[in-house]
Amino acid sequence: MKNVYVWPHFDPILVRFGPFAIHYYALAYITALVLGWRLMRRLVREAPVVATHEQVDDFLSWATLGVVLGGRLGYILFYQPVYFLDHLNRTYAVWDGGMSFHGGMLGVAVAILIYCRRHGIDPWRFGDRVAVPVPIGLFLGRIANFVNGELWGRPAPAWFPFRMIYPESGSDVPRYPSELIEATLEGLVLFIVLLIASRNERIRSQPGYLGGMFVMGYGIARTTAECFRQPDWFLGYLMFGLTMGQLLSIPMIVIGATMIWRAKYVARRQGALATA
């Protein structure tokens, strides 16, 4: 068969130290946090100045907690609540995968609100700066999914230029490499769009605009990418033939658009007051 490749059976563990091991999945999270921290230190000092470097350093631990707790709780509540009620001892096994981006996003949003309230920072502007580096983590996370041979795609038509057989799927049917498609849409493309937008001082000056772009952009990217991804076997297709990922992402498009509208409205109102 032309344009068909076999998933190369990567070892999900990068390095072993006796009883300890570093998984690619964990490495993706750590790398994303470090790169995001570095980028955010630069973003918060660009006009209008939002926070200090020290506050960004301090927030890193809050963001980590929000991602891990929110991501895990989101996966449990959105995807497998019944399973984890019967297997409470598996609740903490994050090294085996099972993290929800939507849950992680909510966890970080809560962390932003609490941290900004404690330190007198505008949460809208701070959230804008947090939003820009997030696609880095999405990109690396999807690459880790590919390395783990999980979240494979739906059967792909013969004309698709890069089909892949996943032995772990239990069949030799060529599929979409959905992890790589998601890495491209949710990660690479969204990051480029946000990075370019963040260079525009007019956009940066509208609190909530960049955050709205991220929320709406992710909603569009994830909803589109889910069309190539095989639904979770324990959920399948849900109402209207949509997947859980799509049901969680479609509202994000509306929420993100509303955030952008609000940002423009607030900016116009502040401009009118300044000239009054």
From Swiss-Prot:
Q: List the disulfide bonds.
A: none
User: Transmembrane ranges?
Assistant: 17-37, 59-79, 94-114, 132-152, 177-197, 208-225, 235-255
Q: What class of enzyme is it?
A: transferase
Q: Where do the annotations place a 1,2-diacyl-sn-glycero-3-phospho-(1'-sn-glycerol) binding?
A: 142
Q: Keyword set for this entry?
A: Cell inner membrane, Cell membrane, Membrane, Transferase, Transmembrane, Transmembrane helix
Cite the GO molecular-function annotations of the record: phosphatidylglycerol-prolipoprotein diacylglyceryl transferase activity
Q: Which GO terms describe its cellular component?
A: plasma membrane
Q: In its UniProt entry, what is this protein called?
A: Phosphatidylglycerol--prolipoprotein diacylglyceryl transferase
